[in-house]
Amino acid sequence: MDYLSSMGSQTARFCLILLFLFYYLPCALSQDDLWGCGTPFRCGNITAGFPFLGGIRGEVCGHHSLKLNCNKHSNTTSLIFSGHNYTVLYIDNNNNSVTLGLSRQDFSGPFCSASFSSTLLSSGLFQNLPSYKSLTVFYACDPRRHFLGNFTCPVKGLGSIIQNSTYGILCDGSFSVPVPTSFVSEEEVLDLTHLESVLRKGFEVKLNIDEIPCPLECFSSRANCLFLAGSCCKYHDRTTTCGGDTGDLLREIIPNTRSILITIGQVVGFHVFIIVVMIIAFLFWRRKKVNDLRKQNLEALVTSRRYSYRQIKKITKSFTEVVGRGGFGTVYKGNLRDGRKVAVKILKDSNGNCEDFINEVASISQTSHVNIVSLLGFCFEKSKRAIVYEFLENGSLDQSSNLDVSTLYGIALGVARGIEYLHFGCKKRIVHFDIKPQNVLLDENLKPKVADFGLAKLCEKQESILSLLDTRGTIGYIAPELFSRVYGNVSHKSDVYSYGMLVLEMTGARNKERVQNADSNNSSAYFPDWIFKDLENGDYVKLLADGLTREEEDIAKKMILVGLWCIQFRPSDRPSMNKVVGMMEGNLDSLDPPPKPLLHMPMQNNNAESSQPSEEDSSIYSEV
C-alpha cells in the first residue's frame, strides 16, 4: 500500500507539471504574444510593424521568416534568412509597399573570409528590383589557365568575377550575389576591391505584400493580423475580405468571447489527450522496469538445479527430520541421491508475490565463496517453494558453546570475509540485512558460512544509498538508519553494524551475569555501553573466561575494538567490510580506540524479527 500510495502521489505531481507546461504556460504565452502585435519593433533607426516579428512581437504577429533581431550595443538590426545573417539598413513603407535594404554580414570584412555561398531570397516573399542583377563569382579555378578579373584567396584558390560561361567548366565552385546593374559590365575587367565596396553597401528587395494599411484597420477594431498565405484580409462585421490573389495572406482575429472559448476548448482537449498518453506511457515504463528487474532475478535461477516438489519430498523423506524453524519457514534435513546431506528450507505457503524467494535464490546463485553457504537447488511449483542448501553438521553459531578465543576469532574473521565478498566480490553488490548468530552456520571444522538471504537486496556497486519500503532484520542487530533516516541513509554499512553487534556478542555474551537487568535476557542492545566502560577501565579481560594467555587477550581486545568501530550510529563513521577484514587481520597496536556511541538501542529480544513474524528456534540447526 505504501508503494501504491507513493506511486499515486508521484503520478499526480507528474500530471500537474504536465498540465502547467502544456496548457497554462502556452495559453499565457499565446495571449501575451497576441496582444504584443500592437507594438512595433524599434531598434536604432529601424521601426517595423506588420508583417515583421521581433521584440515583444510574437510568432503570431507576422511572418516567421521576417524575425528582426536588435543588437543593443551597436543599435543595428539583423535578419536571418536561408542561413545568412543580414544587416537591415532600412525599411521603407511607401506607396503601399515595403522595401528593405539588406547587407550580408559576412561581406563586411575581407572578401576572402566570407562564406562563398549564394544570396538566395524566397521569390514568394521577396521581389527583386530591376535596378539589381545577379553576379556570379567563380573560385577554385584551374591555375594553369588565364582568367580575366582574377583574384586569389588562401583557401579558395584562384577565382574570377568575369561573367564568362566557360569559366563554370574550368572552376570547381561558384556562387551568386546581387549587385547594382550599373556595376556589372561584360566588357570591362572587374576589380575585386570595387566588388568588396559594392557588397558592403548591400542591396534592395521588395516584400510581396499587396496592402499595408491593414494593420491600422485591425488595431482600430481591436483585432490582430496574422500571417498565413495569400494577401491582406480585412475584417468588417466579422467577415473577411482578401485583397489580391498572389503573395502571402494576412488574417485578422477579433478577440471576442466565443472565439476565445472555442480556442481554449481546442487547446484543453488536445493537451489533455497528450497528458493522458504521457501518463499511460509513464505507467507502462514503470511496469516494464519492475518486470525487467524480476526477469533479471529469475534468469539467475536458471544456473541452479530445479527440483520438483515430489523430488523435495523424497529428498527429505516426506519432511520427517526438522532441524530448524523460523519466520520464513521450516528447515528439514535430507539426502541427495549421491549421498550428500542437505538442508531443505520449505517456505510458508503464499499466494502473493515471490520477491523474498527470488531474492534469496537469485542472491545465492551469484555467489561462490568459502564463507557463503552453497545453494544446491530450488523448487518453484505454484505456491510450493523450497531452497536446497548444503548441510553443515555443527548447526548455527548461537547453538555453539565453549568455543575458545582463537576459534571465535576465526569464526568472526570468516564471517567478515564472507560479508566482504557479498559487498565487493560479486558482479552485483548483495546487502544481507540479517547478520546474526542464527544465520552463521558452522561446518565440521567450525568454519563459518553466512546463510539465509531472504531479506537480501541486490544493487549496483556504485549505488551508495538503498531505497527500502520496510524495516528488515532482527532487533538487536538492526542498524539505526533502518529505524529512522535521521541517523543516515541505508547502505551496505547496515551490514557492518550487524556484524559489529555479532562480534560483541561473541565476546561479551560469555559473562551473562554482568548484565544487571535480569529481565533483559542479555540483549545485545546493551553490549556497547558496558563493554565500552570496561574497555576504558582496562577491565576488558573480565568479559572473557579466566585463564587466557596474553595472545588470547590481545585477540579478544582486537575483536572488541573492531566491534565498537562497526556499531557507530552514523553509517559514515563505520568502516567498510574490506577495511574491517584488514582490521581483523592486522595488529592490535594499529587499531585506534573508536568514539563512544552516544545512544543505545531499545531493549528487545534479539531473536525478534521486525520484517517478518518470528518463531522460537527449536533445534540445533537454525533456518538458513
Swiss-Prot record:
Active site: 434 (proton acceptor)
Ranges in the topological domain labelled Cytoplasmic: 285-624
InterPro entries registered for this protein in UniProt: Kinase-like_dom_sf (IPR011009), LRK10/LRL21-25-like (IPR045874), Prot_kinase_dom (IPR000719), Protein_kinase_ATP_BS (IPR017441), Ser-Thr/Tyr_kinase_cat_dom (IPR001245), Ser/Thr_kinase_AS (IPR008271), WAK_GUB (IPR025287)
Start and end residues of each stretch annotated as Disordered: 587-624
Disulfide pattern: none
Residue intervals passing through the bilayer: 264-284
Protein residues bound to ATP: 323-331, 345
Reactions the enzyme catalyzes: L-seryl-[protein] + ATP = O-phospho-L-seryl-[protein] + ADP + H(+); L-threonyl-[protein] + ATP = O-phospho-L-threonyl-[protein] + ADP + H(+)
Biased composition (Polar residues): 603-624
GO cellular component: membrane
Stretch forming the signal peptide: 1-30
Organism: Arabidopsis thaliana
Entry-linked Gene3D superfamilies: Phosphorylase Kinase, domain 1, Transferase(Phosphotransferase) domain 1
Pfam families, per the entry: GUB_WAK_bind, PK_Tyr_Ser-Thr
Record topology, Extracellular segments: 31-263
Coiled-coil residues: none
UniProt superkingdom: Eukaryota
Annotated membrane topology: Single-pass type I membrane protein
Record's keyword annotation contains RNA-binding: no
Keywords from the UniProt entry: ATP-binding, Glycoprotein, Kinase, Membrane, Nucleotide-binding, Receptor, Serine/threonine-protein kinase, Signal, Transferase, Transmembrane, Transmembrane helix
Residue ranges constituting the Protein kinase domain according to the UniProt record: 317-599
Glycosylation sites: 45, 75, 85, 95, 150, 164
UniProt-recorded name of the protein: LEAF RUST 10 DISEASE-RESISTANCE LOCUS RECEPTOR-LIKE PROTEIN KINASE-like 2.2
E.C. number(s) listed in UniProt: 2.7.11.1
